[in-house]
């Protein structure tokens, strides 16, 4: 299946892209992140909690313009044509 990934902020800086399409065999968010980490290892530090072996809790995931609120975001199923974005927490003042 083919998934579109949208990159913003630090993600865009690291990848040098605002979007890309990735062929995916495993149909979960964790499967997608694994594929992304193989291509852009630096992204792993931004969104992966090595100690707990899961996505960091402060990372927001948007699939097809809908914010995912499930506790275990990594297990979310993806289907062909999904559009996915990972968002870092907003800072301001």
Predicted regions and their residues:
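Ubiquitin-like/PB1-type beta-grasp interaction modules and other compact soluble beta-rich domains
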Residues: 1-92
């Amino acid at each position: 299946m083919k998934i579109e990934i949208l990159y913003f902020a630090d993600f865009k800086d690291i990848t040098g892209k605002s979007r890309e399409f990735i062929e995916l065999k495993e149909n979960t968010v964790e499967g997608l992140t694994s594929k992304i980490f193989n291509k852009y290892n630096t992204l792993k530090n931004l969104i992966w909690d090595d100690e707990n072996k899961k996505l960091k809790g402060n990372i927001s995931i948007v699939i097809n313009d809908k914010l995912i609120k499930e506790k275990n975001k990594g297990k979310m199923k993806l289907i062909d044509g999904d559009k996915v974005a990972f968002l870092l927490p907003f800072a301001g003042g």
